[in-house]
Amino acid sequence: MDVRKDQSHLTLNQTPEAHVEKSHAPDIIGSWSLRNREQLKKRKAEAQGRQTSQWQLGEQKKRKYQRTGKGNRRGRKRQGNVEQKAESWSQTENERVQEVLVPAEEETEYSGNTATQALPLRASPTKAVPTEHCSEVPQESLQCQEITIQNHSQTHQRRDKAEALSPTTCQEIGVLQYSPKMCQDMAEPEARSPKMCQETAVPQTYSPKAHEDMAEYEALSPKMCRETPVPQYHSSKIPQDMTGPEALAPDMCQETTVSQNHSSKVPQDMAGPEALSLKMCQEPTVLQEHTLKICQDVARPDVLSSKTHQEMTVPKALPCITPGDAAGPEGCSPKTLPQSDVTPMSVTPGKNTSHPDLGTAVAEGCFSEAGECIVSEDISTKTHQEAVEPKFLSHKTYKEFTVPIVSSHKTIQESPGPEEYSPGSRHEMSGPEDLSIKTCKNRDGPKHSLPEGAQEVGGAQRQDPDAQDIEDAGAFSQDLEEGNKADQDPETPAGPQGPQKICPENDVHSSALF
């Protein structure tokens, strides 16, 4: 039993010790919960220390990057670009505001100056012209850049225009707004004569039809170019300036009318000038309708009067015309005869085709020249009375316009007439020898005037030596006839000898015409 008591006592003793141990156990051994709490506290402290250390390290690193300048390069570039843009934007806004304000103030000042002070004449036309037409402002504005500030190219031009608006500098700006050619035209309006104004105004209203007319002058044959020498010698500027009908000189009108007579297309182009009267416009149309074939069929132009026709038919109705009578109408003006001598060139082959009939050829030559003289005289006088003379065409020009065509038609009509007569009848009708001598002299008369007509037509170079040969042949025939006159009686008719001695002269004349 004592053992049990001892064991129980031990147990009792042990229990309080165990209790005591339990109270002091956390300090030595502790429970799991207490241990966990302590560990948690330690962990928290360590975490806080780590955080503080990391924060300190981060700040140190930032300070190093800021000192060395190696960190955040992209960010710095962006910040610099934004700052520069903001500065440039502010500058441009300030400049625009200044530009808007300065021209408004200076325009008010300029308007006040124009109201009080009168600008010179050279500046007045340039002021009214808008600035849209300026073509050389960038080149010319370099002269005025000394006044303006050299910041931007656009502001230079605007400030040049704005700051240079005093009455003296406005002239320079007005001159800069034009090309050099326009400046010359607009610079001195007072110094211009009316002739210069016409020259500048006509090329603007120059029609393409006038160009065609000028092209027709160049396309003429060499013979016609000789008749119209002025368009070749004039410069290209003068025909353009003088194409207006009001400014045509008399010489120019003469040459245009001569060209109408020799070409079929030119009268169509030249028929419509305003300076010609209605009747003058009708005459070229009548001449257009009569072609060369109708002229050969003996067509009569509308220009001739009935009296002219009666006089034209006289050489056919009078078969007994002697060389003396034929010598009468040969007192024509030297200006009309060369023109009629030129036109029968188309008829001369008909004269010289038959050499055996020498008397007939002589008769043809005499009658043709007599008919040509009558035609040239009557037409040159009567057509002046019938037709209305234009303002700018002289009498000489009008003769050149009408005589060559009509006289050629009538010569064609009348030249076949004397062919009906035989050589015997021609010998019987011929008068005494002194009349034939007179005929030779008179026939030599128009031949002396041939070079003058050839100068008008342009063929003087070809016909001058032939005319000298004709004169020598005429003098030789006169000497022969005077020798025969001493042998024969004055009462006997010398008809057969007269025409036979005229034959060599006719041959020389035909060769000259060819």
Swiss-Prot record:
Expressed by bone marrow cells and osteoblasts. Also expressed by ameloblasts in tooth enamel (at protein level). Expressed in enamel organ, ameloblasts, spleen, bone marrow cells and osteoblasts. Residues 441-450 have a biased composition (Basic and acidic residues). Residues 61-79 have a biased composition (Basic residues). Keywords: Developmental protein, Differentiation, Nucleus, Phosphoprotein. The modification Phosphothreonine is found at T322. Residues 1-96, 408-514 are annotated as: Disordered. Residues 7-87 are annotated as: Necessary for nuclear localization. It is found in: Nucleus. The keyword Protein biosynthesis does not apply. The modification Phosphoserine is found at S90, S124, S153, S166, S179, S207, S221, S259, S264, S277, S305, S415, S422. One of its GO terms (biological process) is cell differentiation. Its main location: nucleus. This is Hemogen. It comes from Rattus norvegicus (Rat). The gene is Hemgn.
